[in-house]
Amino acid sequence: MTWSTPVGLCTGLAALVLLSGPGQAAPQLRVEGTEFVLEQDNGRVLRGEALAGAVLVLPQGRIRIASVAREKPPYGSEIFLYRFLVENSAGSSQELCEPDPNGQRLGFPLQVPGEPAGLTCTGGAVGKCVRFGYQPWYLSKEGLPLKALHQACVNLVTANYGGDRGTTRNGTPIDIYDRFGIQQPAYAPGMAFEAAWSPRGAVCVARPRIEQNISLDEIRQKYPHLQGFVGEEACSEEKMRGHPDALLFNRSYPGYR
C-alpha cells in the first residue's frame, strides 16, 4: 500500500491522571491497545466515546478529549482515534496533533509491551504504523509479536537505515508491504525497490529514499553491518524474501526530491 511519510508527535503518559471533581478520589486510568479505560472508585468503567469531554492532567499540561472515533485497521483490533485539545490557564485551547495526510488532527494512547504508555498522533510514524496493522500488542497469524513489525515499520517510514536517525522528508510517497500479508504492495508505476527492514533498521538498501539526505556511500561508511548488502545488485526483494530478519519491504521513487 502506498503512503506518504510524515513525522509526528509522541509524548509520554508518565503520571497520567484523569481530572476528578472536588472531594472525589482520582479514578484509575489505563490503556488497552489504543483505548483509554477509566475505572471509577464506585466500580463503574468508562471507555470509548463515554470519555469525550474528559480532561487528562499530564506534566505537559491539561489535555481535553474533544471527541472519540473508531476505525478497523487491515489487521488487529479496533483503533480508537481521539481529538486532543491542550488547555492553558487562560481557558483557551489548541490542537495537540498536527494534521495528518488526510487533514485530520487525531491521536491515541499507545501501550507498547515493556514500555511506558504514551500519546501519539496519526501523522507520525509510530501512529501510522499502528494504523497500517502493525499493532505492537498483537501477534501475527504466524505467532510473531507485531512489536517487531511495528518497530521495523517505524524505521521504514522514517528511512532509518542504521537504526540511529531518520533520513526521510515529510510527504515522500512510499509503498509499504510485508512478508505476512498485512500490507500488500501497490505496484505504483515508477517506484523501485528501496530496502528490506528489521526492528534494528535496514537489512539491505538498494538505494536511499532521499539521496540529498544520505547517499549509498554514506550508508556503507556509517553502517559497517550493512557491508555487502548495499546497492541494487546486493539488495532486491527476491534475495531478501528468504532472509529471516527481513520483515517489511518498501518501494519509492528513484531520484525523489
For the regions a language model picked out, list residue spans one by one:
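Bacterial N-terminal signal peptides
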Residues: G8-L19
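Boundary at the C-terminal end of the N-terminal hydrophobic targeting segment
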Residues: G23-P27
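Long, compositionally biased low-complexity segments
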Residues: R30, Q40, A52, V57-R257
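Extended effector regions of multi-domain proteins
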Residues: T34-F36
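N-terminal secretory signal peptides that target proteins for export/translocation
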Residues: M1-S4
